[in-house]
Structures are given as structure tokens and as C-alpha cells.
Amino acid sequence: MRLHRLRDRSGVRVQDRLVWQAASLLLAYPDDGLTGRLDTVAELLGHVAGPAGELLGHTAAALRAREPMAAAMDYVATFDLRRRATMYLTYWTAGDTRNRGREMLAFATAYREAGVPPPIGEAPDYLPVVLEFAATVDPGAGRRLLSAHRVPLDVLRGALADAGSPYAPTVAAVCATLPVATDQEARRADRLAKIGPPAEAVGLQAFTLTVPPRRQEGAPSV
């Protein structure tokens, strides 16, 4: 049986886990460890079949072709300076409201229940962290977290695609591992992309996993 058809005991396809792991590495901040992460991604892609491998490969190739400083500046401009491109998943479901703390706690609780501590260097809802958890710790719980935040992922995918970002194919590969979005989810994603998340400014103490941390805030600049 081919690797992409195999499933682990949680029922998650091995190929999906490979996609999540590669995506986690590609979506991390391009620091001094980027070359090593790209080498790991190349090894993973040797086992990823079909369109997913091509999508991830596009991002990997684009990152290899860029100078480190240019890659870092593009990353900040893409994910920190564009509200629609935030990778903090609860930002789209709760915005800067009191509910966001509770929603981030749900991620931290999922990590603890799987036997690992919450993140140390990033917020628990940060997409590369969630992908790493889904790929390497608890695929079933990880898929549930990703599926529950399909709308934010679709908003992110659309924003990156509209901007012509090299990261867009990677988020598209992640979305392809999840159940197809319903009509209601598609409408909600479109609405959020136009008007933004709920608003209620309050102070939040962000949780602080192993992807390279970039900052302490849990929300992007607007």
C-alpha cells in the first residue's frame, strides 16, 4: 500500500501529517535555521504525493531563492503588517475580545491532554505551532483544532493568494487536508475578510512550542 493511503491509529492519513509537518516548517519565521528546515522539508516532500507536494514545493523553492534578509522582511510585511494574513487562528474567531483568552485556552488544554506542555515561545493558536502539534503529537486532536478553524484558514489562504505571496500554496496544501468548507463556512470567511474580526480591546496575556518565536504579542499590527 502506498504511503499516502496509510492511516495511523487516529484515522489520520500519514500524508496529511507529512503535509502539516512540512507546512509548519515553511510557515515559521525565516531565521538562521531556515536552510536546515528547508532541507527537512525536501526530505518530507519525497514522501508527499500529488498536488500537495507541488504546492509545498513552490513555497520551498521561493524561500531557497531569496536572500535571508529579504525573506525575513517579506515575512514581517506579510504576516505582521496585514491583518487578514495573521496566523493567530483565534484572532479571526474572537478578535481582541475577552472570548479570545478562553479560545486560546482550548488550544493549550488540547496540548496538555495530549501530554505536552503549552507553547513556551509562541501563542498556542499560532498556525505553525498547531501544525507541528497535529503532525508530531496528536494527529486526531490536531485535525480537530484545524477543522474547527477552517474559516480563519480560508481567510488566510485568500489573503495570501490575493497578495501573490509564496506562502499561499502552503496554506492551500493545509486546507486540502481538511474537510471541504461548507457554504456557510465559505460565506463566513468572505464576511470576515471584508469586515474583520470581533472588536473589544482588552489586555491579553499570550501563551508563550518549538517553532522559532518572533514576538510576544498575540495579534498582528493593523
Mark where each language-model region is.
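Charged, alpha-helix-forming regions
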Residues: M1-L127, L131-V222
